[in-house]
Amino acid sequence: MYRKDSIIIEEWLKRSDKALLVTGARQIGKTWLIREEIAKSGYRKFEVNFIDQPDLVDYLNVKMSANEFLVKLKMIMPEDCKPQETVVFFDEIQKCPEIVTKIKFLVEEGSFKYVMSGSLLGVELKGITSVPVGYLTVLTMYPMDFEEFMIANNVSKTTLEMLKAKFETCQPVDE
């Protein structure tokens, strides 16, 4: 399925030395899009979903140094998750906000790329200790726009271009 934000995630995977935070409403495709882009990139993915794996909230959402956190994280990773080859994906990050505080140090350490996603983050993350300014790229996703919806429904490029031209010139569309 085509989403315009896929280009942003693709570029982040290729070039960025920052973590990525993907926010937006529930059920708009954040998790799906992140998984898709990581799969296409050739990176391995280690995913932690803090709603599906609530025991990991208690394990990771405690005050500890970044080094201690990294050791704990590596303990739960499969052996095939190698440094420089793996993207660590924290999904539903609003359930484990302490990780956002540690991202600066994890990014500086450089073993892995980090992507986080969650819903209602503006409300849920108010209590974090420190926002990692300069170490985090934020992408706000929205529900599909009309063009994305049309592409998902296999509307041809020619038809899309015609509809766009009609819209821009305020002309009616033929039935």
PLM features: residue spans?
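Conserved P-loop NTPase "ATPase switch" module shared by AAA+ and STAND
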Residues: 81-98
